[in-house]
Each structure stands twice: as structure tokens, then as C-alpha cells.
């Protein structure tokens, strides 16, 4: 899938990320989901099982940095910043946010 963001901004004092893609899809993705589903190796379990990240309901996005033409890095209020969020990943998170959050809450 080739999707490109036309607009990307943190909103609601950093509690959400709004992304508008070139196919006109607009998503508001909560910071909690972005943090607990971070694509970083330590969260995704590249060196062991996937970690369940707890107590991130009040997490906020501090800063967004563009990585080339394909992704962003998000710096969160807990200092986590090692995940690289590709455009495709953000689109997937936006499209499947409710399901991903339900799965996360069920795992707690």
C-alpha cells in the first residue's frame, strides 16, 4: 500500500495525532495506542516476547520528528522515542484503532 500523509499534527495537548492521507482518509489516533503499539524493538519483542506496556492512559506526544520521506519518530512524555512509525503503519493504526485498543485492554 502506498499512502502518503497530506497533514500530520498532534492535537488535544498531545493526547492524539491527526493524520490526513492522500486517499482522503483522516484518522485521529490516540497517543496511548501509539505508545503501547510502538514499533520499537523493545516493545515488539524482537529479542523475546512482545511486551505489554501498562499505565499509559495519560501519555502524551511531546514532539514529532520526520524520518526521511517515509516515517516519523514520536517522543512521548515518558521519554520513549525509539519507534519509527511508517506512513503505512500509521494508516493501519488509524484504520484498526478500536480493535487494537480492545485487544490491548483485554490483555491487561
Residue ranges of predicted features:
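Motif-centric detector for short Cys/His coordination patterns
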Residues: 1-108
Amino acid at each position: 500500500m502506498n499512502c502518503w500523509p497530506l497533514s500530520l499534527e498532534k492535537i488535544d495537548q498531545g493526547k492524539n495525532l491527526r493524520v490526513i492521507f492522500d486517499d482522503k482518509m483522516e484518522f485521529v489516533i490516540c497517543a496511548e495506542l501509539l505508545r503501547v503499539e510502538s514499533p520499537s524493538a523493545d516493545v515488539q519483542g524482537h529479542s523475546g516476547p512482545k511486551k505489554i506496556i501498562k499505565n499509559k492512559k495519560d501519555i502524551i506526544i511531546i514532539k514529532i520528528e520526520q524520518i526521511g520521506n517515509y516515517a516519523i519518530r514520536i517522543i512521548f512524555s515518558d521519554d520513549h522515542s525509539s519507534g519509527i512509525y511508517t506512513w503505512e503503519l500509521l494508516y493501519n493504526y488509524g484504520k484498526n484503532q478500536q480493535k487494537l485498543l480492545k485487544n490491548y485492554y483485554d490483555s491487561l
